[in-house]
Amino acid sequence: ESKSLIPATSVKGAISHRTAYHWNRFTKHFVDNAEAIASDRNKACLDIFGTTLDEGDIKPSRGKAIFSDVFIENTDSKVLPHIRVDKFTGGVMDGALFQEKVSTAENQELVEEIWVEKEALQDEDVRKAFEKALQDICDGLLPLGGGTNRGNGIFIGTLNIQE
């Protein structure tokens, strides 16, 4: 029996980036004033996800969040044919036909379990940024994976926080 997989690393990366975005927003670090802080130097990301950087006051640290892989059972799949368009002529390139198999899991409940050490969420802005990033996935605002312009990777759900 085949199953589709949503790897924890993919979800973790997307949530880390979105957490950095919301932390910058809450702390008024906007890109136009050159104070926006990238994910690898962002307080929220450092507190929750850790870093491999070793520069100045930033030291390597392990992440304080554990994400689970999600396996999707009983999925329907569609095979989508694609062609490659020649950018000079606008025509189809010879030998550039390929197919993509897409899993669909409409109306199927998926559970992504995330464990975070309490100390990582002590700062109010860090906690709010992380929770808002998670809520963005539940609201369908943060798609995961490729092909999102075709509607792939859109999730709608609920956020259940347990202390």
Language-model segments: what does each one mean?
Residues E1-E163:
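Small/polar/charged residue-enriched interaction surfaces, especially the RNA/DNA-contacting tracks
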